Amino acid sequence: MTSGLLTPIKVTKKRLLSCAAALAFSAAVPVAFAQEDTGTAITSSDNGGHPGDWLSYGRSYSEQRYSPLDQINTENVGKLKLAWHYDLDTNRGQEGTPLIVNGVMYATTNWSKMKALDAATGKLLWSYDPKVPGNIADRGCCDTVSRGAAYWNGKVYFGTFDGRLIALDAKTGKLVWSVYTIPKEAQLGHQRSYTVDGAPRIAKGKVLIGNGGAEFGARGFVSAFDAETGKLDWRFFTVPNPENKPDGAASDDILMSKAYPTWGKNGAWKQQGGGGTVWDSLVYDPVTDLVYLGVGNGSPWNYKFRSEGKGDNLFLGSIVAINPDTGKYVWHFQETPMDEWDYTSVQQIMTLDMPVNGEMRHVIVHAPKNGFFYIIDAKTGKFITGKPYTYENWANGLDPVTGRPNYVPDALWTLTGKPWLGIPGELGGHNFAAMAYSPKTKLVYIPAQQIPLLYDGQKGGFKAYHDAWNLGLDMNKIGLFDDNDPEHVAAKKDFLKVLKGWTVAWDPEKMAPAFTINHKGPWNGGLLATAGNVIFQGLANGEFHAYDATNGNDLYSFPAQSAIIAPPVTYTANGKQYVAVEVGWGGIYPFLYGGVARTSGWTVNHSRVIAFSLDGKDSLPPKNELGFTPVKPVPTYDEARQKDGYFMYQTFCSACHGDNAISGGVLPDLRWSGAPRGRESFYKLVGRGALTAYGMDRFDTSMTPEQIEDIRNFIVKRANESYDDEVKARENSTGVPNDQFLNVPQSTADVPTADHP
């Protein structure tokens, strides 16, 4: 289905029959779809139109995630009950925003699957599996997630992790067209490690889709396809062609004239692609008739390796506005020039109307990874103001005229050549979890967090590895040492002391927090605001909450059995208001940070969609709380080999199976797996890809058999030195690990402020 590149697959009767196993089936949708133009309907959503639907990723083009529904409100939300649940077929991370159109819910799930459900009952109407190959999993940094779909005139559109964009008939689930979005002929870097996990957006009949991959090696771009035919309309690259040549794209003129001079004439960007992937936020604004792109980090992260430590590297860490008809550049605002911290600008872009110096302005409000809350003019891109929404130690504020950061000298770690502990770290003060805005309270609700990172350069200069992250960082220092060395124990305590998660209700007029809601740890779900003066949010500890939007008081809590990182939606079906959310623990925090992620709350995945109403009568089945249980490891390993294996593990394995071989609860904990117990069994798994179909790719082209054996010895060593602690943590009446990370208690300190961590 990926052949033909930009030529959409032509759907014939024969092709449909031959693909029957992968196509959707079952009964017709029991509702009538509206005949109104979808663009008009989405536009009206900001003005009270279609209150019972959720037609676009952020509900409306403004992406405020605000619903005018108020059947559920502060007076009765405490009476919410589970109305229905639908168990998913993949117990991995779920980040999707379901769409609801005339009583039908369209939910994208892990491995890029699409489910159409009756929004009133949760009954499956049809299902579509694009059959993403398992070996594609290691091309992505952060789980095989999908953040959502788009709806347009009777069709639903979604991206697949292997780079396709698919259009389905919304009523039947049958394939209309499919196109591969990654052009073979383009200069995209040597790695070409592209994935699609973001939700497409539709602007004036064009389906917009970006991609990810900068951790491995990629050159960012956004493509626009005709919603009816799947034909490519235009493409915009976000960083220059390495030879400063035209790509035959809408971005040619601006990249060659303005962006290319901001990059070093040499550097790893010319081989790695430079980065700048648009993996999440794409927004069409009908008020300005512009499309806003949130542009990501550099590839590699290391600024000195990437660009010789020269130039601002446009358009990394920027919001770029382009013409939706032509894809041509209109303006840009760079939030993080010279990015060397993975401070992406792909976080949710939101538009709203608000007073600025006594005048109503149409603005973009943005809370990217770097910790600053920005307000910029939506028409011109002119900086209006910016303040930290959390503690940050990389900049001494922003220039009041230009918005350029005033760098802390030590934060420029690639130029000083010295390690630097950054707050925020690479996961940002705010990541993909969606924020929301209420026009009633005039507050923006941000799922904020604080996860530091020690930045230090790759030893011996930049070296790229196939099938691995290529950041230009010392991967041995990206996590926490896990032993009884007093210095390492002290370092863990210091780390956990500043590890936090909270929701900040930000007043964009005062540029200050109105209130905050403390959570157990970071990596919590997105927000929903409603006219009932309620905000809804799922948490990493497995709870689903409703808070008073005016003061943050906790009004309702439901044990969802698994962590929630997705944002909720609300809608009506048969005249009744529901609130729904996807459940499932995943993403890069539990993948890479492993055991540290346990401090947000122990959770075992039971991935599903859950929906609430005031008269719900459903209940969840019993849950498995134990997760991966310790198994007595083989007692012997080679000390010299395990030392070499530590570097190889951190380079090739930690991004999925956790720092220092401690799983964060999504993928198998290799310490307790049977594979490392023998050399041959481990090589079959890692070298020959015995579990490729399940997402564990083969690495015999990336590592030698001896290097794979080194990794096995390291895992056995880690199993032996952590087994007793893991068993001890489960010595209680439930058998569930207690609230500790290797006997280092989590801090209960207050959330950080702008001037204190």
Curated annotation (Swiss-Prot):
The active site is at D342 (proton acceptor). Induction: Constitutively expressed. GO terms for cellular component: outer membrane-bounded periplasmic space; plasma membrane. PROSITE patterns: BACTERIAL_PQQ_1, BACTERIAL_PQQ_2, CYTC. Ca(2+) binds at E215, N297, D342. The modification Pyrrolidone carboxylic acid is found at Q35. It is a peripheral membrane protein. This is Alcohol dehydrogenase (quinone), dehydrogenase subunit.
